[in-house]
Regions:
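Short, internal strand/loop/helix patches
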Residues: 58, 112, 126-158
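A short beta-strand-turn-helix
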Residues: 57-76
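Short active-site neighborhood of thiol/selenol oxidoreductases, capturing the structured segment around
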Residues: 71-91
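Positively charged n-region of N-terminal signal peptides that target proteins for export
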Residues: 22-26
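Thiol-/selenol-based redox modules, centered on thioredoxin-like
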Residues: 157-193
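Structural microenvironment flanking redox-active thiols in thiol-disulfide oxidoreductases
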Residues: 91-129, 141-143
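N-proximal helix/coil linker or "cap" segments that precede and/or mark the start of modular domains
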Residues: 31-55
Length: 193
């Protein structure tokens, strides 16, 4: 139902923005701002190389609690962040890692995807895309805040962090989409020399 006097006047006629529901406008605005305006990026400092894996706990898509510090205490752990499940860029990022799963496994890399979506959205996204890794539902934003990737509109900024034995060894501050796995593998090749 349109707001009287705001979106139903002569200027609103025919404009798709005016026809969006009241509940959709904030989501569309948030997606637009985080996509096209980098100054709406992070409100805090992102973790840097050398930082310890934050001791935060978050539920995965099935409601199972995951303690990140414990999960990443030994070996490689990739934690990647995306703004919204089932959106084009986020799907490309996850599918890149899915498609390189065998290569990542050979290198001993475990993967967690994180967004501020709820568990059911994460489960649907995981199932639709056949992701072989867990997706964390950071509804209370504890993980995004601990990693310094919560943007000014409260969503996770696209980024990725690779940990070795609980210490950050690589950061992709902008979070690649279709080539996320390639960038991780390229870094791992430099470590094996």
């Amino acid at each position: 139902m349109p707001l009287r006097g705001i979106v139903d006047g002569p200027l609103a006629t025919g404009h798709s923005w005016a026809r969006l529901s009241i509940t959709m406008k904030p989501l569309v605005a948030a997606m637009f701002l985080t996509t096209f305006f980098p100054f709406f990026g992070n409100a805090a400092e992102k973790l840097a190389v050398g930082a310890k894996l934050p001791a935060v706990t978050c539920n995965d898509q099935d409601g199972k609690a995951v303690e990140l510090a414990k999960a990443g205490a030994e070996g490689y752990l990739l934690v990647y962040f995306y703004p919204k499940a089932s959106t084009p860029g986020c799907t490309k990022q996850g599918c890149s890692l899915r498609d390189a799963w065998a290569q990542l496994q050979k290198q001993g890399v475990r993967v967690y995807g994180v967004s501020t979506d709820n568990e059911s959205s994460q489960k649907q996204f995981k199932d639709e895309q056949s992701f072989p890794f867990a997706l964390l539902a950071d509804k209370d934003k504890a993980v995004t805040e601990a990693f310094g990737v919560k943007n000014l509109v409260g969503m996770a900024s696209r980024s990725a962090f690779l940990f070795k034995d609980g210490v950050c060894v690589w950061v992709d501050p902008k979070g690649s989409t279709a080539d996320q796995a390639d960038q991780v593998m390229a870094f791992l090749k430099t470590r094996s020399r």
